[in-house]
């Protein structure tokens, strides 16, 4: 009898065998390099691999070059994180049956990420509920942190590193000021320590009224000297606890959240105050452009009317984070008119990986075609960074629907390289997750499922947005 066990999806797309015993050489030992070496030793079945730390004018800090000469592979990057990304890329190519065997000709692959910042936004609350989450509770067990570290924290970091995601915002944009308390900063530090070897920086969503709610001040006016001093001291405290902290994500004057407009100040004045506090530590502010403008009832125009006149007024370490469409993550929207309308202001796109308007975790909706459609109109090079609202929770398979994992995977791959096609990404995910690329019996099934994935988003558009009408769902929960 042959033992049979069910596949629970917990290994995501990282289902390769772990008994390869590959020959790997590294320049030194470190937490990050040790991970890269161990991943390759366990999974790589190809030629001997030498990892080399070396500056290269053609490589960005996280870029890498894989070169095959005769029967040896050399992997080069300026940084340890770049070598880790290269290790995962080698394993991906192996699973796709594309690389790593002896060849009569020399081969070379060069990869540079399109964006320095490739970040997940978790809309996770401190009570472990998730706004627009459909895969269980929040991964972050705040009550047990910092003393108890779940194995899933490292598994989460590993999954993100394998697809090139290098940053995470841990908490909801509708933020509790409690996240900035000394008690919670120690909890955040514990997570940052787990993520760091995988090249992942931690960021926090903040409540703009934190000086009042947490600091006992009478105002949160960004031009008030006591408010400025409070934020500078708080930022100093954060970096003393987490030296490589990334910065803040801010939802201000939107859906009831406090912001600078409450004090007759502009979004730029609010963002710049925070940016000035973060700048000595090389931190950044991601300031969301999702606002309900008081000056015009047409929602599709509101972000444009509010932000376009502020072009050129933001500090250089502020990035305006704009939803891909002008309304709110609908199954199909035109791109936001803010893209390209603020040439003197760094911008980043916010995609929604979680399926708030596309059937929760009940529906198969492969979202890479939607994001590919966006990049057909908005030049990737016009953006400074890319964010995705996460679809991850405590469900055994991480994302609820078995195919929702593909959207997490696709976001990471497209954040690294926006020129990848949704077809290619779907094929990668399927071969790593469900099918053995070397087994010809799998090919017909894989072909049919690939087609199903590629047609799924358009099907959602057809039955959720007939005649181009949007917001057709029940009140509140958006289903």
Region annotations inferred by a language model:
Residues 240, 258, 265-479:
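Substrate-binding groove of N-acetylhexosamine-processing glycoside hydrolases
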Residues 25-30, 53-57, 76-78, 124, ...:
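Structural motif
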Residues 1-70, 78-81, 105:
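Acidic, contiguous N-terminal accessory segments
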């Amino acid at each position: 009898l042959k033992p049979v066990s069910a596949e629970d999806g917990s290994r995501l797309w990282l289902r390769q065998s772990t008994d390869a015993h590959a020959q790997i050489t590294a320049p030194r030992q470190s937490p990050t390099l040790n991970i890269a070496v161990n991943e390759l030793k366990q999974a790589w079945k190809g030629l001997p691999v030498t990892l080399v730390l070396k500056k290269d004018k053609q490589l960005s800090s996280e870029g890498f070059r894989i070169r095959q000469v005769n029967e040896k592979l050399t992997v080069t990057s300026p940084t340890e994180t770049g070598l880790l990304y290269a290790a995962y890329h080698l394993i991906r190519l192996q699973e796709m049956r594309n690389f790593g065997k002896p060849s009569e000709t020399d081969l070379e692959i060069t990869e540079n990420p399109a964006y320095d910042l490739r970040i997940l936004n978790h809309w996770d609350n401190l009570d472990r509920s998730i706004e627009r989450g459909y895969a269980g509770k929040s991964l972050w067990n705040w009550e047990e942190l910092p003393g108890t570290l779940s194995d899933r924290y490292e598994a989460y970091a590993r999954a993100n590193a394998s697809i090139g995601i290098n940053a995470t915002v841990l908490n909801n944009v509708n933020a509790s000021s409690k996240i900035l308390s000394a008690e919670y900063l120690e909890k955040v530090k514990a997570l940052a320590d787990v993520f760091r070897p995988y090249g992942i920086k931690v960021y926090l969503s903040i409540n703009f009224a934190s000086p009042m709610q947490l600091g006992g001040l009478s105002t949160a006016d960004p031009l008030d000297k006591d408010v400025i001093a409070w934020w500078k001291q708080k930022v100093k405290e954060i970096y003393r606890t987490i030296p490589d902290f990334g910065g803040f994500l801010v939802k201000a004057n939107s859906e009831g959240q406090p912001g600078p407009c409450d004090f007759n100040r502009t979004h730029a004045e609010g963002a710049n105050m925070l940016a000035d506090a973060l700048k000595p530590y090389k931190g950044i502010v991601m300031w969301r452009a999702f606002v309900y403008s008081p000056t015009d009832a047409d929602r599709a125009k509101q972000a444009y009317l509010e932000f376009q006149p502020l072009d050129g007024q933001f500090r250089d370490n502020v990035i305006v984070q704009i939803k891909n469409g002008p309304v709110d993550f609908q199954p199909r929207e035109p791109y936001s008119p803010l893209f390209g309308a603020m040439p003197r202001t760094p911008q980043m796109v916010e995609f929604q990986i979680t399926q708030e308007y596309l059937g929760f975790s009940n529906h198969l909706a492969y979202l890479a075609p939607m994001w590919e459609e966006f990049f057909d109109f908005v030049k990737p090079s016009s953006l400074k960074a890319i964010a995705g609202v996460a679809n991850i929770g405590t469900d055994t398979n991480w994302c609820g629907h078995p195919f929702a994992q593909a959207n997490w995977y696709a976001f990471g791959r497209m954040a690294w390289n926006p020129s990848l096609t949704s077809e290619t990404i779907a094929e990668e995910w399927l071969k790593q997750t469900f099918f053995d690329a070397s087994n010809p019996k799998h090919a017909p099934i894989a072909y049919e499922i690939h087609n199903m994935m590629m047609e799924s988003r358009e099907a959602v558009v057809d039955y959720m947005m007939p005649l181009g009408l949007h917001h057709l769902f029940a009140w509140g929960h958006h289903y």
